[in-house]
Amino acid sequence: MVDPIVTKNWRDLIKPRGLVVDQDSLSNTYGKFVAEPLERGFGITLGNSLRRVLLSSLQGAAITSVKVEGVEHEFMTIPEVAEDVTDIILNLKEVLLQIHTNDVKTIRIEADGPKEIKAGDLITDAQVEVLNPGHHILTISEGGRVRAEMTARRGRGYVPAERNKVPGSPIGTIPIDALFSPIRKVNYQVTNARVGQQTDYDKLTLEVWTDGSVAPADAVAFAAKIVKEQLSIFINFDEAEEPAEEIKPVEEQKLNENLFRSVDELELSVRSANCLQNANIKTIGDLVQKTEAEMLKTKNFGRKSLKEIKEILAEMGLSLGMKLENWPPKAAPQGAPKV
């Protein structure tokens, strides 16, 4: 056990009051986060570390190969198709996917002209979600016909086409460069923060742009977790935990009366309502104890459903990931809606 005097090396350092999220600009592809105050120099240390991990280490999904009927290599053309194979491959690289499994998935195009094929026309299964369905892929003229099969999987960072070659693949299979990272851009800025009369502390402002397959707040959390896990091997001691603050007993806390309402009263879309029913979530109290990650594991539950539920809960002063001890209570508070 480490000497309590030594623990002052880290316990006496200034820590941020919390992570502030700019709600006015927050979207499913952009987030602005502020952490302050930090000890001088920690703004650059944390900002640079998070930026590098965000750009290099988060997993995403991408198409890794394509095989088009009648095409042997990428420099050929397809009869009655406006784009040549090279252009089609470039368009396929920009298809944004979310894959809810670690398995390699097969995606198909089966179409006859005249028709414009967009990302939303790709034939997938329930585990593959296309995030930019309006993205153009190719155009088939009258009398044209396209039959194509693609593979897609989850991965990390950038993987060149050469590494996406699979031994034994059918002749005509064309490997594709894959950019798996869901992060499009990361900026950070370090300015001065005030603590009392001192202004020589750091304020870290972090901006994150994603492709929509991961929420910016989740991306930052995942990156921080990666950094924490990597650094943990350098700690060669155990320490006594700091005395816990006295917590007000749950019985004395006034519960939000909305917690006792049925989820049927939320006026959700049919898809979202069915997902909650299949997950056996009956009350709002049951719902708020679920984390975003747990909800996204629910069958057919996607980002749109998540956003819908979060917005409705926010109007009630509630959120996902809440901790409700001894739920459900033996008796609902007076005046609470009956389920």
Curated annotation (Swiss-Prot):
Keyword Transmembrane helix in annotation: no
GO cellular component, one term: DNA-directed RNA polymerase complex
InterPro entries xref list: DNA-dir_RNA_pol_insert, DNA-dir_RNA_pol_RpoA/D/Rpb3, DNA-dir_RpoA, RBP11-like, RNAP_asu_C, RNApol_insert_sf
Catalytic activity entry: RNA(n) + a ribonucleoside 5'-triphosphate = RNA(n+1) + diphosphate
Annotated region (Alpha C-terminal domain (alpha-CTD)), positions in chain: 250-339
Domain of life per record: Bacteria
Comment on protein domains: The N-terminal domain is essential for RNAP assembly and basal transcription, whereas the C-terminal domain is involved in interaction with transcriptional regulators and with upstream promoter elements.
Provenance organism: Anaeromyxobacter dehalogenans (strain 2CP-C)
Region (Alpha N-terminal domain (alpha-NTD)): 1-238
Lineage: Bacteria, Pseudomonadati, Myxococcota, Myxococcia, Myxococcales
Any single GO BP term: DNA-templated transcription
Function statement: DNA-dependent RNA polymerase catalyzes the transcription of DNA into RNA using the four ribonucleoside triphosphates as substrates.
Cross-referenced CDD domains: RNAP_alpha_NTD (cd06928)
Keyword Transmembrane helix in annotation: no
Enzyme superclass (EC): transferase
UniProt xrefs under Pfam families: RNA_pol_A_bac (PF01000), RNA_pol_A_CTD (PF03118), RNA_pol_L (PF01193)
GO molecular-function terms, A-Z: DNA binding; DNA-directed RNA polymerase activity; protein dimerization activity
Keywords assigned: DNA-directed RNA polymerase, Nucleotidyltransferase, Transcription, Transferase
Stated family: Belongs to the RNA polymerase alpha chain family.
Assembly and binders: Homodimer. The RNAP catalytic core consists of 2 alpha, 1 beta, 1 beta' and 1 omega subunit. When a sigma factor is associated with the core the holoenzyme is formed, which can initiate transcription.
Protein name per UniProt: DNA-directed RNA polymerase subunit alpha
Annotated EC: 2.7.7.6
HAMAP family found in the cross-reference section: RNApol_bact_RpoA
